[in-house]
Amino acid sequence: MHKNFLCLKDCSADELNYLLRRAIKLKSRFKAGESYRPFEGKVLAMLFEKASTRTRVSFEAGMAQLGGTAVYLNTAETQLKNKESIEDTARAISRMVDLVMIRTGLHSRLEAFAKESKVPVINGLTNDSHPCQVMGDIMTFIEKRSSIEGAVVTWIGDANNVLYSWLSAASVLGFKVHISAPPGYSINPTQVPNNDDCYDFFLSPEEAAEGADLVTTDNWRSCGYDENQAKRQSKSARWQVNETVMKAAKPDALFMHCLPAFRGQEVSADVIDGPQSVVWDEAENRLHFQKALMEYLLLGKIEDI
């Protein structure tokens, strides 16, 4: 049976560590100008029910760099617009392509598609998780600090899909997540790992950041939330990552943001544009991690690493 990549909690530490090592290797080879095109004749279908910049470009570019082709589909241009079921969509598309990436809202739609698909399915984002983003982030941390095992990652802001993937990764890979969220915007207990040793809660952003190796956040307009944005931003104002928060972290702490960012809201300009910020390396590494992931799903482990 083919593998899917839907949620980090479904992966083993061996699998994730292999993918991270392989992504770093593929990036190195790409930067050296080496041509590596194992996907000649392979096709990736990219199904978008949510808008995207980085997800689309990174998957499309990654497939091209590996010698394959990517086909872009959105809801408005498919029969999903006319209420064709996600199951029937999966049954049809998966007979025509080698791999499918889906960016959607309800995680259950992703799971329903994967259940009927004849080819591997990748989670490009749901309201519950964003595994490719977090694995690209972890790859970036490893490049800068060699290992994430035992590290402290601080999340500042409301609990969302990216945080849930951080928690799953922490449970599998052995690091700790410190969380500080506005009242009413903390985690949903049904969406966190059973291993509660991998995270702690703090009332203030500064307390959460104390001793952190990495501070990360997301914008206050997170995918999947349609409530009044003014109310959300008002409640979140105290949870901005700024110079005060970063000073509470370790002196060499990194700052990450999954983007898009809104300077002056969830993060101050002096932090995201400052020397501790690695957001552009982080954005680039989505490309390289996803190349390693697609290679693994289509070809299995490659041992020249």
Predicted regions span which residues?
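A short, aliphatic-rich alpha-helical micro-motif
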Residues: 94, 114, 148, 208-210, ...
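Phosphate/diphosphate ligand-binding glycine-rich loop within oxidoreductases
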Residues: 38-142, 263
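Rossmann-like adenosine-cofactor binding region
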Residues: 193-270
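Short, structured coil segments at secondary-structure junctions
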Residues: 66, 96, 116-117, 173, ...
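Adenosine-phosphate binding glycine-rich loop
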Residues: 252-253, 258-305
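Positively charged, low-complexity intrinsically disordered leader regions
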Residues: 1-57, 61
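Glycine-rich phosphate/diphosphate-binding loop of Rossmann-like nucleotide-binding domains
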Residues: 49-61, 143-217
